Amino acid sequence: MNSEKPLFSFFVTSDVQLTEQDHVSHQKLASALQDIHEVDPETETLIMNGDLVNNGERKSYEIFQQIMDENPHPNQVYYTIGNHEFFKNDGNEPSIQRFLDFSGLEKVYYDATINGYPFLFLGTESWGPVGSPTKDSAVLSEQQLQWLAEKVDVLKQENKPVFIFLHQPIPYTINGTDIEYYQNGVIQDKEVRKILSQLKHAFLFAGHSHWDLRYPSMLVKQSTNFVSSGAIYNTWGLDEEGGEIVTDPAGSQGLYVKVFHDRVQIIGRDFSTKQWIPEYTHTILI
């Protein structure tokens, strides 16, 4: 890897899908945190982009926090809500509240400034019903979209990259999002696209699909840079019938992002083998 020192760096992960009884999920989270620390012990920021827990249970959040406390990790950890945070299936409000209690946030959408660069975090505000083709979709309220539009209206005046995080990917972007299940992945996808297209250098990171970062087109450069961040719990891919299937139950992946004054470098990391993913090394000029 290039020895030039970046302005700053951060890691992006998603889809830990931890539960109390699934000790493999505990081990994978701990292993990922340890590898992140070994790769760059000086990085100060980690984004965990949804599906932190598999069932939305408060006990799962408690174990998640315990593992975080027991392992080295960057000082600043930012969370987004995914679809699995709703899987206790007791309604939107209690599901969201458990996530907010865990994360210490006031809303599922918020912003931060990290090393002088803007970060925007989005999140679904509704889930279900079970059996619906939009059960796992991201639903963004008018208030959230208005908030995003107002943030972008200010940020579009700058030439800095803007880093945005939403658990579900925008349909018809990264590989796999043309599959039927993902076609309704973000109900307000057209609105989000339109808002983000005003930015000169927008990076929208998504998890959810678990698709192996070794596949082509897991980062797509359109008016916005659409970025897949892999998954900690396992990796998926295309099956022989045009659907998707688990390709590696032991797979565990995430991203290492380095920001320079003239470019952003995004590199895939295999936490299970503690190796870089050469197929997922991207440099986007600013």
Question: What is the meaning of each model-derived region?
Answer:
Residues 169-211:
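Flexible, glycine-rich surface segments
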Residues 1-63:
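N-terminal active-site segment of His-dependent metallophosphoesterases
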Residues 57-158, 187-201, 214-266:
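Extended active-site neighborhood of metal-dependent phosphoesterases/phosphodiesterases
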